Amino acid sequence: MTLRAAVFDLDGVLALPAVFGVLGRTEEALALPRGLLNDAFQKGGPEGATTRLMKGEITLSQWIPLMEENCRKCSETAKVCLPKNFSIKEIFDKAISARKINRPMLQAALMLRKKGFTTAILTNTWLDDRAERDGLAQLMCELKMHFDFLIESCQVGMVKPEPQIYKFLLDTLKASPSEVVFLDDIGANLKPARDLGMVTILVQDTDTALKELEKVTGIQLLNTPAPLPTSCNPSDMSHGYVTVKPRVRLHFVELGSGPAVCLCHGFPESWYSWRYQIPALAQAGYRVLAMDMKGYGESSAPPEIEEYCMEVLCKEMVTFLDKLGLSQAVFIGHDWGGMLVWYMALFYPERVRAVASLNTPFIPANPNMSPLESIKANPVFDYQLYFQEPGVAEAELEQNLSRTFKSLFRASDESVLSMHKVCEAGGLFVNSPEEPSLSRMVTEEEIQFYVQQFKKSGFRGPLNWYRNMERNWKWACKSLGRKILIPALMVTAEKDFVLVPQMSQHMEDWIPHLKRGHIEDCGHWTQMDKPTEVNQILIKWLDSDARNPPVVSKM
């Protein structure tokens, strides 16, 4: 029968070095008889302290003194003396903190899941009630999102190698034994699975195990391109709504804990445009709030043009923070979201912990030239003139939403729409294919998410962001001479042919603490086009410049 499920042990397989490998390493370091600590670990067999720990009958802090006593008894039997400073707690604290995700093994699991395999973790583990328990929580939180099932011995009251846990596994997978491959680093844990008819792989080193896994599955797992970062499934996310004024609410998706980071998308997009950044930033230790900007998705979309001027939008973002009890947040924007976050830094610097923009530069207002004059002088912005008349662009963009998003969401090395002479041509899509090919950046399922979102909101609200040029200019002129002094990041994309990198060349004159990132071979849709590079740049900057300062009570 064909394999269709892959099961991975945690300790020694998905996470290295194995925690319980510390027993042998400690024996060697302290010149103790070989096997002494392992004997103490297994003392009592099915009724012993370790089995009770793994079944969740006692916690790790309860187990530690029992293990200390077992070590003392075993050392007396062996007629050896343990060092005076011998501490099982210290030994296991260090071993647990040293354990990291085995990335090649995780990548193999991701590849198998992508190819249609059901994946699971089957682990003997414990209830961790130590002061240092957050490390295990972080490890499990990151791993869980990549697997269909997680079976923890301490939660189900069964342990490997007891036969019943393997039957429980098969019931959970809804699979027959011959459809399952199981990887573990302990031979005794593999035997019952093999006796049932599962394919088993003993993991002694990762490369050898993956070669064997390749062989039994027929799927290439080694020397493959690095996978895309973890994405978001909209139905699995936590969705929130904040009413910022009567009849206007903002929708957001939230993940993670730590300093707040507000992600602000551009036109014509969605919170979902940050789908590759949300898990990465959350895993890096931030509370991510990915916005549906006003006019989009599940946020309110009032029809009035003035509802979308920057002054109103920024005031509403401040109210959003107020309603969530956030004194400050990091603001990261792209496209129009980038424009908004620069305005937040200018007019509400006390509420902005740090600010970053992808593609959109900060350019101070020119009091001697209105923005419409500037746009008319630059042919690449001709499409923005086409967007000015209410109803015209809406009709074209809403006519066939699938065509709209497939035409717009293109990588820089694919055929892209020209933004020149849009008014003269009478539309964005004139002479473009009725059925555009799908970009390598997106899947059909992702395109359909945008289609469904814009069926709800339409394009009037999103286009109204373009129809406040004069209002935004007059407001911006109030900040003439003002500098942005908070931590800031500008990320340019080499092949964005509208927001070209050269537009950002004088930003240091106005933002003295500006840091920069640059992504080569990247077009306008930066988060989708180069998600790995975006994540690396953002996390490095956040960790160095955007961690919250200590909170001092004013009570």
Swiss-Prot record:
<dbReference type="Pfam" id="PF00561">
    <property type="entry name" value="Abhydrolase_1"/>
</dbReference>
<dbReference type="GO" id="GO:0004301">
    <property type="term" value="F:epoxide hydrolase activity"/>
</dbReference>
<dbReference type="GO" id="GO:0090181">
    <property type="term" value="P:regulation of cholesterol metabolic process"/>
</dbReference>
<dbReference type="InterPro" id="IPR036412">
    <property type="entry name" value="HAD-like_sf"/>
</dbReference>
<dbReference type="GO" id="GO:0046839">
    <property type="term" value="P:phospholipid dephosphorylation"/>
</dbReference>
<dbReference type="GO" id="GO:0016791">
    <property type="term" value="F:phosphatase activity"/>
</dbReference>
<feature type="active site" description="Proton donor">
    <location>
        <position position="466"/>
    </location>
</feature>
<dbReference type="InterPro" id="IPR011945">
    <property type="entry name" value="HAD-SF_ppase_IA/epoxid_hydro_N"/>
</dbReference>
<dbReference type="GO" id="GO:0042577">
    <property type="term" value="F:lipid phosphatase activity"/>
</dbReference>
<feature type="binding site">
    <location>
        <position position="9"/>
    </location>
    <ligand>
        <name>Mg(2+)</name>
    </ligand>
</feature>
<feature type="domain" description="AB hydrolase-1">
    <location>
        <begin position="259"/>
        <end position="531"/>
    </location>
</feature>
<feature type="modified residue" description="N6-acetyllysine">
    <location>
        <position position="215"/>
    </location>
</feature>
<dbReference type="Pfam" id="PF00702">
    <property type="entry name" value="Hydrolase"/>
</dbReference>
<protein>
    <recommendedName>
        <fullName>Bifunctional epoxide hydrolase 2</fullName>
        <ecNumber>3.3.2.10</ecNumber>
        <ecNumber>3.1.3.76</ecNumber>
    </recommendedName>
</protein>
<dbReference type="GO" id="GO:0042632">
    <property type="term" value="P:cholesterol homeostasis"/>
</dbReference>
<dbReference type="GO" id="GO:0070062">
    <property type="term" value="C:extracellular exosome"/>
</dbReference>
<feature type="active site" description="Nucleophile">
    <location>
        <position position="335"/>
    </location>
</feature>
<keyword id="KW-0007">Acetylation</keyword>
<keyword id="KW-0058">Aromatic hydrocarbons catabolism</keyword>
<feature type="binding site">
    <location>
        <position position="383"/>
    </location>
    <ligand>
        <name>substrate</name>
    </ligand>
</feature>
<dbReference type="GO" id="GO:0016311">
    <property type="term" value="P:dephosphorylation"/>
</dbReference>
<feature type="short sequence motif" description="Microbody targeting signal">
    <location>
        <begin position="553"/>
        <end position="555"/>
    </location>
</feature>
<dbReference type="InterPro" id="IPR029058">
    <property type="entry name" value="AB_hydrolase_fold"/>
</dbReference>
<comment type="function">
    <text>Bifunctional enzyme. The C-terminal domain has epoxide hydrolase activity and acts on epoxides (alkene oxides, oxiranes) and arene oxides. Plays a role in xenobiotic metabolism by degrading potentially toxic epoxides. Also determines steady-state levels of physiological mediators.</text>
</comment>
<dbReference type="GO" id="GO:0042803">
    <property type="term" value="F:protein homodimerization activity"/>
</dbReference>
<dbReference type="GO" id="GO:0005829">
    <property type="term" value="C:cytosol"/>
</dbReference>
<feature type="modified residue" description="N6-acetyllysine">
    <location>
        <position position="191"/>
    </location>
</feature>
<comment type="function">
    <text>Bifunctional enzyme. The N-terminal domain has lipid phosphatase activity, with the highest activity towards threo-9,10-phosphonooxy-hydroxy-octadecanoic acid, followed by erythro-9,10-phosphonooxy-hydroxy-octadecanoic acid, 12-phosphonooxy-octadec-9Z-enoic acid and 12-phosphonooxy-octadec-9E-enoic acid. Has phosphatase activity toward lyso-glycerophospholipids with also some lower activity toward lysolipids of sphingolipid and isoprenoid phosphates.</text>
</comment>
<feature type="active site" description="Proton acceptor">
    <location>
        <position position="524"/>
    </location>
</feature>
<keyword id="KW-0216">Detoxification</keyword>
<dbReference type="GO" id="GO:0005777">
    <property type="term" value="C:peroxisome"/>
</dbReference>
<feature type="region of interest" description="Epoxide hydrolase">
    <location>
        <begin position="235"/>
        <end position="555"/>
    </location>
</feature>
<dbReference type="GO" id="GO:0000287">
    <property type="term" value="F:magnesium ion binding"/>
</dbReference>
<dbReference type="InterPro" id="IPR000639">
    <property type="entry name" value="Epox_hydrolase-like"/>
</dbReference>
<feature type="binding site">
    <location>
        <position position="185"/>
    </location>
    <ligand>
        <name>Mg(2+)</name>
    </ligand>
</feature>
<keyword id="KW-0460">Magnesium</keyword>
<dbReference type="InterPro" id="IPR023214">
    <property type="entry name" value="HAD_sf"/>
</dbReference>
<feature type="binding site">
    <location>
        <position position="11"/>
    </location>
    <ligand>
        <name>Mg(2+)</name>
    </ligand>
</feature>
<dbReference type="GO" id="GO:0005782">
    <property type="term" value="C:peroxisomal matrix"/>
</dbReference>
<feature type="lipid moiety-binding region" description="S-(15-deoxy-Delta12,14-prostaglandin J2-9-yl)cysteine">
    <location>
        <position position="522"/>
    </location>
</feature>
<keyword id="KW-0449">Lipoprotein</keyword>
<keyword id="KW-0511">Multifunctional enzyme</keyword>
